[in-house]
């Protein structure tokens, strides 16, 4: 197993992650709306002015539907959703504008250091392992790498990468969500290193792998759908004469398709993962308990909260990821290590 695929994947993922970080932050804020600890404070940062003549609406994505169930008394955690009169649609763009207005432009890059560390650990690992398995499992005579085999390689690579990158993932979610919390509950982490250190000391080392079962499953779904779709669509385009292996158009089309497939497939488990990682303590009995409470209190479409920013983030992220990856591969093709 060579080191070069890990380096190539890591470089591409860091660039893609840093450039699309604001979209990921907006996605996290929208996914956390409706959770008991989420703040709709009209001015969470008192040092920044806010025009109180403009109503601030709850962060609900366009696909969210009001729950017809209401509060369930049998659930151990009672979360009372806002009344229908206070619920309204707020687009990802409006959420981003609200963050800039109330927290400042720099808030869109809250947790970017954690994103960079996460990509170094998670994406470099998953892409390196996928490349290794691809080389091992591709038929040497025909060059055939079946779709089912691609998906299997993606599932394995995603699982390993997620375990390695989970501490950075927890830190990233905490740092991205911090601005949405009431002032007295904010963690105010100085950096990803400070976040990981404080989480480990205050909540125990095991808390760095909080939600790891979800992270593993999400990473398996994302990696399998993302990498397998990219390779497969690319092969179809080339075989059909609609593109060349090294063509930019081929890379753009394949990466865009991969981003959309990954976003739709992973959003439900991503929402649950975000809720569990953002919790300061174990308020949920597990992933299933978290999902049940969300659906009961916020409606079934709560599992697709943040789908629009997820898709608008996954699309550009995946396109930048693979376009950069192809260029890095070209630059390092003659380098041996």
Curated annotation (Swiss-Prot):
Main location: mitochondrion
Entry keyword Repeat: yes
Location of the protein in the cell: Mitochondrion inner membrane
Molecular function GO labels: dicarboxylic acid transmembrane transporter activity
A GO-annotated cellular component: mitochondrial inner membrane
PANTHER family associated with the record: MITOCHONDRIAL DICARBOXYLATE CARRIER-RELATED
Protein name: Mitochondrial uncoupling protein 6
Gene, per the UniProt record: PUMP6
